[in-house]
Amino acid sequence: TGLAALKWNGLDVSFIRKVEKGREGWLFLKEEVAGRNELLQSLGIRPYRDIERKLWNLLIVQRAAWAKTQGIQYVMVIVPNKASIYPEFLPARYHSADSSRALPDPPGVPIVNLTADLIRQKSIGQLYHKNDTHWNELGAFIGYQSLMRALPPPFQEAPLPLDSMQVQWVTEPGGDLARLLLMDSVLMEKAARVSVRHPQARCEISCDAPFGPWMSPKHFRNPHARLPKVFFDHDSFFKSVAPFVAEHFQETIFSWIWQGFHQDMIEATHPALVVDEFVERSLIGDRPRNVP
């Protein structure tokens, strides 16, 4: 809108308090809901309260213990906030604190934190959208590579190399942060499009349904894969990871839900591995929960 553009261009501030205007056209999410501030978390300014850490650790340990009783390996995966990867584009008034970032540390549970690999790979290209909270498809590909290297045996496997992908950069409308500002048609950006050149995995169930929260899980099959069935409980970040990881498993099930754990679906499909993925900011400011 005109008012949004005026505040953006003339006053150098964003239209709403949820969005922080960074340097060089970058946008960042601030407080998504009360108590969940991504910037304070990524900068280490907002450490965990003891009760929060205990609740999250208990929940994750319970999920892993239940999976073990079913003969299923459980792995927790953490996708970093954009501000954790690109703090250099935050406004100059933001500074990191000495305290460590707020993340659970459940004892005895395998955790794959993708942050370090994404930071190391920033030189290959932009990994997150400037005006969206999410990584772009190049960032998703780097996250996929990191995950496949870090999974516990016998699920670990060498990831596909980048040169086996088709990579294009396309101009597209602004993402979720630009939409919050009512400026998605103004704040255009180039975004990576990454696809497997010769895919072997095929979607077989819910292929035409929208890929979104609370939708029917999507099932992929690859008869040429070595690894057994896997179930991904994930959020919006793994929508773009799905085509890559599906290449490695005989059957891959993707169920999109915020913080949730589809125990009934997991029990019914009985995978060998459950990957429970969380974006970093989802691990604070809310009571963790399971979905029956």
What is each model feature region?
Residues 1-292:
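Extracellular glycan-modifying ectodomains
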